[in-house]
Amino acid sequence: GTRYLDGNISAAGEQKGVDIIAAIREAVGPDVEVLIDAHALYNVPTAIRLANRLAPYNITWFEEPVPPESYHALRQVREQVPTRICVGERLHTRFDFVPVLEQRLADFIMPDVTWTGGISELKKISTMAEAYYVPVSPHDASGPINVMAGAHVMMTVPNFYKLETMRSKLSAYDAFITEPLVCIDGNLQVPRTPGLGIEMNVEYLRAYAVPEFSGPV
């Protein structure tokens, strides 16, 4: 990965990325979804060029093609690419999603329950999206609490699409919680116990806390 500097990508880097996606598509066949996250790194012409080059490989979505500060930039990309667009992890509260939904700037939205205002706000955003027939796929960059909070909300959302996790295996979260998350055939099992249904491993968290960045545990 890299930071946003001027929104460009080198010719070699671009070709490498396209080659990787081509190889993935060939390996998994036509029926497996391939989702691309641009992480808001690109300017408008670069995002358009990349999306068009990736289109032949039938990607499910091109996520955050441009930085989130400009809906106008997002619209330019939206109007000039055939790939489906996903945005939302860096949008905060339901009000930020209004122009995205009203102007049809995305095919999918990806609000983050911990960044956008909590469980109630995620539910409101999802209900708004339902009125526009836009699927919701909650973002995860914070761990098992984030995953489980998003899962609980999605149990009540007809337009739920997929639940993201930042880990290739949910078992990577096991050390942080007293009981592991259970995933069967790709489906996260939501506990029936009170609250979110998980308990944090407080002793583990205390052992690895960084004093400069943490309060009482």
Task: Locate the predicted segments by residue.
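Metal-dependent enolase-superfamily TIM-barrel catalytic cores that perform enediolate-based chemistry
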Residues: 1-75, 80
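Structural signal for hydrophobic packing residues in well-ordered secondary-structure cores
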Residues: 25-28, 58, 154-158, 209-212
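Shared catalytic-loop signature of beta/alpha-barrel
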Residues: 52, 58, 67-187, 191
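C-terminal extensions of enzymes
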Residues: 177-217
